[in-house]
């Protein structure tokens, strides 16, 4: 069996979050991980960026925009069956607001390049 070491790339750098992981699932607010002993780990605001079986590693990327993006994607998929567009509009508004917040923060930190 192949067990994976899991790292997360954050704005602060790379951190190891789990070892001997045999299960990973992207959920709306986190990535759920389970190791060979059944212990569970949740990494918030993240998605799976790389799986490298040869190196027995799984990499996650963490950002505050991931959850609003996944909520928007989920709403878009759900509207096909529910025919309720309201949730799409609300989640799109939330995603744009989070994107604006991140862009403003980066602009304050680095300014505009000429």
Please identify what each model-predicted range represents.
Residues 65-110:
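Charged/polar low-complexity intrinsically disordered segments, enriched in acidic residues
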Residues 15-73:
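Compact, glycine-rich, soluble single-domain proteins
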Residues 11-18, 89-91:
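Short low-complexity stretches enriched in small and charged residues
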Residues 1-15:
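Eukaryotic proteins' extreme N-terminal regulatory segments
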Residues 112-114:
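Long, compositionally biased, intrinsically disordered regions
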């Amino acid at each position: 069996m192949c067990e994976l070491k899991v790292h997360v790339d954050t704005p602060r750098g790379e951190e190891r979050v789990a070892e001997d992981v045999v299960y990973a699932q992207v959920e709306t607010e986190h990535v759920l991980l389970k190791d060979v002993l059944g212990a569970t780990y949740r990494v918030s605001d993240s998605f799976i960026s790389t799986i490298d079986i040869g190196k027995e590693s799984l990499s996650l990327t963490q950002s505050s925009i991931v959850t609003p993006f996944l909520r928007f994607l989920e709403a878009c998929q759900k509207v096909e069956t529910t025919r309720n567009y309201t949730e799409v509009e609300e989640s799109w508004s939330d995603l744009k607001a989070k994107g604006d917040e991140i862009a403003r923060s980066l602009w304050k930190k680095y300014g505009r390049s000429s």
